[in-house]
UniProtKB/Swiss-Prot annotation:
Catalytic EC class: transferase
Protein name per its UniProtKB record: 4-diphosphocytidyl-2-C-methyl-D-erythritol kinase
Family label: Belongs to the GHMP kinase family. IspE subfamily.
Molecular functions per Gene Ontology: 4-(cytidine 5'-diphospho)-2-C-methyl-D-erythritol kinase activity; ATP binding
Catalysed reactions, semicolon-separated: 4-CDP-2-C-methyl-D-erythritol + ATP = 4-CDP-2-C-methyl-D-erythritol 2-phosphate + ADP + H(+)
Matches recorded under Pfam families: GHMP_kinases_C, GHMP_kinases_N
InterPro entries in the cross-refs: GHMP_kinase_C_dom (IPR013750), GHMP_kinase_C_sf (IPR036554), GHMP_kinase_N_dom (IPR006204), IspE (IPR004424), Ribosomal_Su5_D2-typ_SF (IPR020568), Ribsml_uS5_D2-typ_fold_subgr (IPR014721)
Positions of ATP binding: 96-106
Superkingdom, natural source: Bacteria
Keywords: ATP-binding, Isoprene biosynthesis, Kinase, Nucleotide-binding, Transferase
Disulfide bond positions: none
Length: 301
């Protein structure tokens, strides 16, 4: 059986830093919106673990050793279960690295769910999320696969229902280090704790914001230019995560496609819709149902 699964992007519709723990981790509040656009992972039978990476539209400089979160996820799954099974994993990369759209975390989550199915391990989402949290604070939200209001260091996740909005996501061609942003002394770390609003439409209003945005634009003026360009063309703009990607909510997908044609040189972008259930869960469920049907019929998978 060969299994092909998506690793969807996310947006932080807002990001408040509400404190800092004694261990250095930041307390936060955020809303995660999952998108119907992202990377793709393919799992093929093999005796050992291996990873190949392909960058869509260009040559890949992504690591294929254990420094890659995909292989870290696979090794963690093996260690947790005692499994010694292998798989040939192929990553098709579309999401920018250091973009704030969760590319590495989403890849890791897809590796966990994909290999859990591929190796027939039978772990629950809670068990996979626990493993995922050791890889990164954003991994659990991709494991659970729901739009979410998140708190703590990002591990306290409450599923929510968001409008299925269209977004334009723009990457200004720079890489932002999360550690650099969170380590900046000017970063706001005392935003008052908010309550889940009655209307989730309000999370894109001024009451909510991204605390990392001011610091990121100081370090990387291109982010400020991106926000200004988006505001000029759509009337709204916000940075996701610690950057560098910025986004605007659109009136529809067609508006986004038109704006993509107008992007300044060296910028890239994509248009996507938010979805309350991850494409990963939808496609994995369909693949497993098809596999069971094929197995019961006696035909080769």
């Amino acid at each position: 059986m060969t299994l092909t699964l998506p690793a969807p992007a996310k947006l932080n519709l807002f990001l408040h830093i509400t404190g800092r723990r004694d261990d250095g981790y930041h307390q936060l509040q955020t809303v995660f919106a999952l998108l119907d656009h992202g990377d793709t992972l393919r799992f093929s039978p093999a005796d050992t673990l291996s990873l190949q990476c392909h960058q869509e539209g260009g040559a890949s400089d992504l690591p294929t050793d254990d420094s890659n979160l995909i292989l870290q996820a696979a090794r963690a799954l093996q260690a947790h279960t005692g499994s010694s099974k292998g798989a040939a994993i192929t990553l098709t990369k579309r999401l920018p690295m250091g973009g704030g759209v969760g590319g590495g975390s989403s890849d890791a989550a897809t590796a966990l769910l994909g290999l859990n199915a591929f190796w027939a391990l039978g772990l629950t989402l809670q068990e996979l999320a626990h493993i995922g949290l050791t890889l990164g604070a954003d991994v659990p939200v991709f494991v659970f696969g729901k739009s979410a209001w998140a708190e703590g260091v990002g591990e306290k996740i409450n599923p929510i229902i968001l409008p299925n909005d269209a977004f334009l996501v723009v990457h200004p061609g720079i890489h932002v280090s999360t550690a650099r942003i969170f380590g900046d002394q000017q970063l706001t770390r005392d935003t008052p704790i908010s309550k889940l609003p009655a209307s989730l439409e309000t999370v894109l209003t001024r009451e909510f914001h991204n605390d990392c945005e001011a610091v990121a634009t100081q370090h990387f003026p291109e982010i400020g230019k991106t926000l200004d360009w988006l505001k000029q063309h759509t009337g709204n703009a916000r940075m996701t995560g610690t950057g560098a990607c910025c986004f605007s909510r659109l009136t529809g997908l067609q508006q986004g496609q038109q704006l993509l044609q107008q992007l300044p040189q060296h910028w890239t972008g994509f248009v996507a819709r938010s979805c309350n259930t991850s494409p990963l869960h939808q496609i994995l469920g369909e693949a497993l149902a098809k596999f069971r049907e094929t197995k019961n019929s006696g035909k080769p998978a």
